[in-house]
């Protein structure tokens, strides 16, 4: 090539054609070196490896083919340009010699219509008559001159696939039948191509430049030696045909059976597959990414066969083609050997025993109902269902019926919670619950089900908190203490990656909580009650599956019924079923009313009882037992400075004046509250938000001292249980504190301090920030934050 370098005449190209066909890899041409006679076109080889009928010639101007002595120099070469089929004078010195089809062999002909050999690209049924018709209609080298005289522009190979990205001449999205666009669409098929396709028998499925051979969306490209067989029946319908075939029902059968098969990878913007009578929306179906299934015939009518290993030809370059649809495909995670469209399943070549083979069924069969549904179908089925319609509910109910609460502390690796909204009151509460050992062990005891295993649920709150607890794992390595200033020992801790518990936030809307209302004050104590009551109610519903008789007992059950309607108590009378006469100290009798309590694991952790006794002259004492999850402590009085003061104020006797009975007589009554049952986990609520008569709300900024070790004195207990509780049953230890920051009752921020057993110290968690603090910082009063919720555990359960 040093003596006579070939010259290139590119002809008249538009700017977009120049950019598309000369800048991209598809616009390159490689030529053999000059050796006295300019050789153009392709070369026929009689015997090719692996039984191929033709030899693939690669083009690229940046490559030079080494001269070969075995290169035959016969005048039967025809000119075929992949750059511009209208230019037979593309290479200087190469003239378009008109050679009749009888003078050449089918291996030596290179059709400009499909950029491939007609003998191998079109003869799907192996008919030599079809090959003759193809050669006659194509005209081979003579066809170039005819098209030049017609002055009708023939688009080069891959023109329409490049226009998928945009352009004025781009066609609308439609189905491709084996790579062909519908001839009714303008600019899709020229008049000559329509005439050429019309002369072909129905069994022949030609390829066009729109279905390139060297493309990653073709199975036969990735495995060059193992393409699909081409024997298509006359009654076969392809994926792109509008009706009467499996392609029309692609939406109903696009996903194969789940058992024994690989799930189908979908595009990033996967749309629901819907059968239609037009070809306008079927382009998306053709753009669906498919995997080769491990079994026989898939439900869409395409039978795929795969082998254990596929040998790729390293000598043949692979060129990536643009995705078939505009949504973009998630092909980054797919293996290279997967077809990307339905049209790629029908690319023709000679079959081989070591490659995926696709067969198209010739008879239409009704689509099978696939157990694997699409994502949008799953979303339709998601939601709350009754426990009777939830097959997993009975399994959870049996587990909870026999559960044993474990109070053993566990060392968990702390993780912050990302707050992208006003979720600090939720995050602070969640961190305190994670630090509660019996709560953690309970949720870890319940299995974690995926959406596939349980698309519909009757226990959304249980599911969410089981998932939350599974986000936390044991501390990997105990942190080593390091020496700091003085004799202090500071421990380092490595928290895990922060995450956003969006599934917890969605519970507010799923259960239609008032906390989800916009413009409403977010309150950590109210959210804690929402969680505990919700978990309790779901567990009650599960108990109904095992004991339907408990259904009538859940009407007044739960800590929600704090207030006592005294008029209703009088209307019930002394003969009510939920009251009895109880003899107290000094032989005093009292009528006790109690709601029907049904125990759940939640009440076994947080549930306590208070006794409210009403004293009235000339009448028996009237007592009512009420359950609670959080003990409400009034701190408004100036005399209350500590938690002990607030507890004593809770049990103090208060008088009520002006009470009128049914006889319209004014009598004096008094009321006293005592603790009937203490829970294993005692949550104290310091009532800092006081509602005024005008409707406003103010925050009490006063500091309330709270100890790390809290002892409940006997004077706080009910008379009947004073002597039944030992000191260890009345002593609690602090393990979590929820703080409220700010001076306003309608705003502010929430943080949490939790005790970490592995660290044997305290952590301060502010959303996703986690840092180590000492115990003094937990109980020390500060102006910027005030304690709002105090979490205590019984010391005998530590």
UniProtKB/Swiss-Prot annotation:
It comes from the Eukaryota. It catalyses: Thiol-dependent hydrolysis of ester, thioester, amide, peptide and isopeptide bonds formed by the C-terminal Gly of ubiquitin (a 76-residue protein attached to proteins as an intracellular targeting signal). The active site is at 424 (nucleophile), 749 (proton acceptor). Changing residue 13 to A/G/P/W/D/E/R/H/K/S/T/C/M/N/Q: Abolished interaction with G3BP1. SUPFAM superfamilies: Cysteine proteinases. Specifically inhibited by spautin-1 (specific and potent autophagy inhibitor-1), a derivative of MBCQ that binds to USP10 and inhibits deubiquitinase activity. Regulated by PIK3C3/VPS34-containing complexes. Residues 307-316 have a biased composition (Basic and acidic residues). Its main location: cytoplasm. The modification N-acetylalanine is found at residue 2. It is found in: Cytoplasm; Nucleus; Early endosome. Its EC number is 3.4.19.12. Gene3D superfamilies: Cysteine proteinases (3.90.70.10). InterPro entries: PAM2_motif, Papain-like_cys_pep_sf, Peptidase_C19, Peptidase_C19_UCH, USP_CS, USP_dom. GO terms for molecular function: cysteine-type deubiquitinase activity; cysteine-type endopeptidase activity; molecular function inhibitor activity; p53 binding; RNA binding; transmembrane transporter binding. Residues 2-100 are annotated as: Interaction with p53/TP53. The modification Phosphothreonine is found at residues 24, 42, 100. Residues 566-581 have a biased composition (Acidic residues). GO terms for cellular component: cytoplasm; cytosol; cytosolic ribosome; early endosome; intermediate filament cytoskeleton; nucleoplasm; nucleus; protein-containing complex. Phosphorylated by ATM following DNA damage, leading to stabilization and translocation it to the nucleus. Widely expressed. Residues 205-219, 328-337, 551-562 have a biased composition (Polar residues). Belongs to the peptidase C19 family. USP10 subfamily. Found in a deubiquitination complex with TANK, USP10 and ZC3H12A; this complex inhibits genotoxic stress- or interleukin-1-beta (IL1B)-mediated NF-kappa-B activation by promoting IKBKG or TRAF6 deubiquitination. Interacts with IKBKG; this interaction increases in response to DNA damage. Interacts with TANK; this interaction increases in response to DNA damage. Interacts with TRAF6; this interaction increases in response to DNA damage. Interacts with ZC3H12A; this interaction increases in response to DNA damage. Hydrolase that can remove conjugated ubiquitin from target proteins such as p53/TP53, RPS2/us5, RPS3/us3, RPS10/eS10, BECN1, SNX3 and CFTR. Acts as an essential regulator of p53/TP53 stability: in unstressed cells, specifically deubiquitinates p53/TP53 in the cytoplasm, leading to counteract MDM2 action and stabilize p53/TP53. Following DNA damage, translocates to the nucleus and deubiquitinates p53/TP53, leading to regulate the p53/TP53-dependent DNA damage response. This is Ubiquitin carboxyl-terminal hydrolase 10.
């Amino acid at each position: 090539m040093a003596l006579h370098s070939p010259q290139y005449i590119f002809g008249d190209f538009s700017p977009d054609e120049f950019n598309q066909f000369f800048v991209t890899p598809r616009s390159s041409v490689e030529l053999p070196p000059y050796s006295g006679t300019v050789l153009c076109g392709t070369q026929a080889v009689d015997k090719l490896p692996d039984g191929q009928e033709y030899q693939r010639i690669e083009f690229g101007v940046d490559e030079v083919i080494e001269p070969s002595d075995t290169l035959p120099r016969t005048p039967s070469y025809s000119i075929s340009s992949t750059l511009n089929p209208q230019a037979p004078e593309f290479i200087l010195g190469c003239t378009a010699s008109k050679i009749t089809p009888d003078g050449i062999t089918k291996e030596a002909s290179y059709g400009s219509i499909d950029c491939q050999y007609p003998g191998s690209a079109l003869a799907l049924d192996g008919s030599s008559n079809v090959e003759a018709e193809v050669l006659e209609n194509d005209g081979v080298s003579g066809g170039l001159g005819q098209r030049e005289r017609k002055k009708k522009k023939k688009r080069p190979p891959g023109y329409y696939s490049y226009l998928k990205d945009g352009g004025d001449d781009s066609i609308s999205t439609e189905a491709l039948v084996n790579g062909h666009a519908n001839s009714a669409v303008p600019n899709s098929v020229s008049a000559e191509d329509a005439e050429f396709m019309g002369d072909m028998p129905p069994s022949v499925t030609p390829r066009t430049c729109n279905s390139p051979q060297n493309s990653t969306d073709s199975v036969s490209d990735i495995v060059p030696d193992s393409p699909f067989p081409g024997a298509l029946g006359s009654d076969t319908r392809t994926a792109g045909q509008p009706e009467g075939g499996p392609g029309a029902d692609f939406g109903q059968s696009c996903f194969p059976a789940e058992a024994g098969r690989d799930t189908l990878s979908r595009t990033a913007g996967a749309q629901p597959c819907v059968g239609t009578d037009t070809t306008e929306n079927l382009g998306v179906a053709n753009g669906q990414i498919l995997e080769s299934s491990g079994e026989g015939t898939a439900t869409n009518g395409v039978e795929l066969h795969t082998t254990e290993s596929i040998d790729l030809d390293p000598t043949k370059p692979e060129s990536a083609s643009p995705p078939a649809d505009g949504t973009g495909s998630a092909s980054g995670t797919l293996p290279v050997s997967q077809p990307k469209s339905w049209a790629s399943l029908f690319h023709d070549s000679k079959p081989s025993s070591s490659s995926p083979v696709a067969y198209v069924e010739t008879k239409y069969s009704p689509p099978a109902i696939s157990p694997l549904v699409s994502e949008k179908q799953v979303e339709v089925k998601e939601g709350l269902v009754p426990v009777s319609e939830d097959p997993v509910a009975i399994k959870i109910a049996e587990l909870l019926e026999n559960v044993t609460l474990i109070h053993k502390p566990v060392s968990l690796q702390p993780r912050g919670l990302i707050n992208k909204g006003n979720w600090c009151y939720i995050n602070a509460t969640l961190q305190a619950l994670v630090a509660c050992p019996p709560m953690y062990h309970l949720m870890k005891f319940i299995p974690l089900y995926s959406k596939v295993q349980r698309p519909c649920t009757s226990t959304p709150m249980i599911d969410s908190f089981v998932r939350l607890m599974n986000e936390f794992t044991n501390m990997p390595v105990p942190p080593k203490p390091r020496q700091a200033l003085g004799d202090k020992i500071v421990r380092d801790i490595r928290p895990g990656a922060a995450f956003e518990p969006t599934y917890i936030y969605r519970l507010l809307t799923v259960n239609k909580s008032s906390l989800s209302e916009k413009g409403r004050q977010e309150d950590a104590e109210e959210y804690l009650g929402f969680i505990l009551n919700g978990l309790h109610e779901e567990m009650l519903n599960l108990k109904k599956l095992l004991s339907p008789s408990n259904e009538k007992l859940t009407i007044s059950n739960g800590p929600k019924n704090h207030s006592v309607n005294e008029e209703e108590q009088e209307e019930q009378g002394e003969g009510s079923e939920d009251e009895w006469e109880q003899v107290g100290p000094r032989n005093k009798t009292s009528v006790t009313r109690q709601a029907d309590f049904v125990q759940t694991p939640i009440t076994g952790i947080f549930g306590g009882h208070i006794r409210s006794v009403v004293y009235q002259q000339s009448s028996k004492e009237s007592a009512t037992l009420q359950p609670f999850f959080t003990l409400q402590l009034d701190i408004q009085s100036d005399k209350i400075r500590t938690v002990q003061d607030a507890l004593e104020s809770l049990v103090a006797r208060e008088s009520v004046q002006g009470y009128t009975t049914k006889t319209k007589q004014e009598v004096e009554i008094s009321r006293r509250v005592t603790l009937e049952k203490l829970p294993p986990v005692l949550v104290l609520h310091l009532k800092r938000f006081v509602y005024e008569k005008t409707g406003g709300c103010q925050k009490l900024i006063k500091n309330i001292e709270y100890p790390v070790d809290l002892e409940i004195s006997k004077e706080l207990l009910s008379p009947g249980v004073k002597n039944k509780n030992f000191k260890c049953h009345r002593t609690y230890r602090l393990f979590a504190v929820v703080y409220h920051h700010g001076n306003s009752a309608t705003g502010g921020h929430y943080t949490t301090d939790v005790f970490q057993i592995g660290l044997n110290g305290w952590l301060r968690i502010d959303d996703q920030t986690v840092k180590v603090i000492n115990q003094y910082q937990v109980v020390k009063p500060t102006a910027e934050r005030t304690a709002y919720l105090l979490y205590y555990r019984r010391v005998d359960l530590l």
